[in-house]
Amino acid sequence: MDVIALHQAGFDNAVASLGTALTSGHASLLKRYTNEVYLTYDSDGAGVKAALRAIPILKEVGITTKVINMRPYKDPDEFIKALGAQEYEERIKKAENSFMFQIRIMQAGYDMDDPESKTAFYNEIAKKLLGFTEELERTNYTQAVSREYSIPYDDLRKLVNSMAMKGGIVKPQTKLKSGINEKNKKEDGMKQSQKLLLTWLIDCLLYTSPS
């Protein structure tokens, strides 16, 4: 089992939801012990679906979430057996921001060579950015998406603001002054107790991909 493999490799804060879907109750329990969770679900379609479902549940209770990339291996057990605990630790350090993970997965459903499909993708990004009610946070994520997907920042900002004004959802973003770049905050001395690896013990009958 994945959680056992993680503990044997020295990742003592690994926990599992024991084959059930992650619930708000699970999230509230995790919140008692940590403010940050690293998701390490299986890398197949079922695992991606589980991660996408878990992210908003964890966010609702105030937990910051990152997603560990285990490819080309399916799960933590396979990964550690093949590459070892040290490499897994490196994957933890490079874990993907949960919002950027959601955007990357969403992109797979669009044809980026087709102008109409590409525009639809940008509109969906803007809708998701509206989920950030604090202006500074929304601006930071707008910048991050702009860089990652080569979308002109001002164009994306205007699109988000337009949707916000039409929906009466949030205050529009202010335009950034030219020549000023936000620096990424680096994790500094994070205590191990603030990190948890959440692994999904998938029910084989429901989620195992057909061979």
Regions found by a protein language model. Name each.
Residues D12-G19:
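Short hydrophobic/aromatic-enriched beta-strand-loop microsegments
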Residues H7-G10, M106:
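Gly-rich Lys/Arg/Thr-decorated short loops/hinges at beta-loop-alpha junctions or inter-strand turns
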